[in-house]
């Protein structure tokens, strides 16, 4: 099944996770779990669409620095929760071209290894593990209405959050992977704009290659997270139960709330 893209013009990568089938024959409910990029500077149209769509909660996965730089638009009738997946110093989102240039101007594949390492860190850091747990708990505390969970581009921190909730709901790994990779299609225009800006600034081809890698998802990034869970924590199920402290009761509640 193809991803359900929301008709929002001022939000990057907006999708409803509803409609995905689970391995035991259930379906993820529509208008419940929405994954997006940042939601600053929303148009009135997009705000009203989300209100009409039943939005009740917004979970901001970004760092405090990012939130201050590009604060969420406060949407009428919704509650906002700040749950940072990454510490302040572990995301390139919101970083200036000048600072990125210092890091990624020479080696055209530096960003690839940087992203793989970021995914490993999101799995191994206690900070991130606690944050994923809090997000899942907040989902379990939402008996009705829609939740937006978002980072900056809606692909990495949001991508792993989506991985965990869909896996817990019983969606198969290949479907989860295809949903994750769909961010590349959704962010094509965004990457093109960034590349043009870098070109106009006279940036090197190596830097522009790295910029595209930073604005993309890849099988290898997600695989590094999965491999880390399997090799260091005994598997995905073990990781979710032990490192994310997700109980059988929490799993049952999430499935009750988000499946039909």
State what each model feature region is.
Residues 1-148, 161-260:
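Cys-dependent protein tyrosine phosphatase-like superfamily
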Residues 153, 157-158:
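Ser/Thr-glycine-rich phosphate-binding loops at phosphate-binding pockets of nucleotides
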């Amino acid at each position: 099944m193809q991803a359900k893209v929301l008709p929002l013009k001022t939000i990057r990568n907006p999708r409803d996770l509803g409609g995905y089938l689970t391995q035991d024959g259930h379906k993820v409910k529509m208008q419940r779990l929405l994954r997006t990029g940042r939601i600053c500077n929303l148009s009135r149209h997009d705000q009203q669409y989300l209100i009409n769509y039943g939005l009740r909660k917004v979970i901001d996965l970004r760092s405090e620095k990012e939130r201050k730089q590009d604060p969420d638009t406060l949407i009428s009738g919704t509650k906002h929760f700040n749950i940072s997946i990454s510490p302040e110093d572990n995301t390139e989102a919101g970083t200036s071209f000048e600072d990125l240039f210092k890091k990624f101007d020479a080696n055209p594949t530096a960003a690839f290894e940087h992203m793989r390492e970021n995914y490993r860190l999101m799995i191994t850091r206690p900070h991130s593990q606690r944050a994923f747990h809090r997000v899942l708990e907040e989902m379990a505390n939402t008996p009705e209405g829609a939740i937006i969970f978002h980072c900056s581009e809606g692909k990495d921190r949001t991508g792993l959050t989506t991985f965990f909730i869909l896996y817990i709901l019983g969606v198969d790994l290949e479907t989860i992977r295809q949903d994750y990779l769909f961010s590349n299609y959704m962010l094509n225009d965004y990457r093109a704009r960034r590349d043009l800006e870098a070109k106009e600034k006279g940036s090197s081809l190596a830097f522009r290659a790295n910029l595209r890698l930073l604005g993309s998802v890849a099988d290898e990034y997600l695989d590094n997270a999965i491999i880390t869970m399997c090799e260091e924590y005994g598997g995905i199920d073990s990781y979710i139960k032990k490192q994310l402290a997700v109980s059988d009761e929490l799993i049952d509640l999430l499935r009750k709330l988000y499946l039909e």
